[in-house]
């Protein structure tokens, strides 16, 4: 352990609620150690309290397809409107969803796959976990993959009660790889899971 690591300490001085609805916004006040010694002044940051989520990339080795879901996403609406391209509000992503209280990431992945892709899975292969936006959000994404029989997939899925309107999209391996290499995917979980699949999973299978 070096000296820089020894200095990494912090103290949370207060947490105030800024908003408490479907999502939460807290105002976090804290101090932390400095690289050059001493402590920072009190830092105040608005923190989007979202909780952890799970992501599951589905694939079918026999059909040589990866499976993504397409849906209209609130986070993409404003940019799509700004550039005058409505279709840009529809994004291609792996199955994903929030992890419920007292639920493991694996349990959430199995549940979300049934809800969003209409198929049952029993096994998940761990990919990684990461913070998608650590400067303002506490969310951690837990990424997994699962092999399925793509012939069992419906064309559409989603719960009406959750305003979900989902299209199931099967993309041939080579087409998905080329889209990935040319920067045509614009969601971090899509990019990371596909990079793992093509450059680690398939590479191991071919070795």
Give the positions of each predicted feature.
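Acidic, metal-coordinating catalytic segment for phosphate/diphosphate chemistry
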Residues: 20-65, 71-79
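Conserved Nudix-box catalytic region and its N-terminal flanking loop in Nudix hydrolases
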Residues: 45-48, 65-111, 160-162, 166
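Short, well-ordered beta-strand micro-motif
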Residues: 27-29, 58, 145-147, 170-172
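Nudix hydrolase/Nudix homology domain
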Residues: 2-14, 70, 83-90, 101, ...
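A mid-sequence, solvent-exposed acidic-amphipathic segment
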Residues: 114-137
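Active-site-adjacent beta-strand/loop module that shapes the phosphate/pyrophosphate-binding cleft
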Residues: 30-34, 133-154
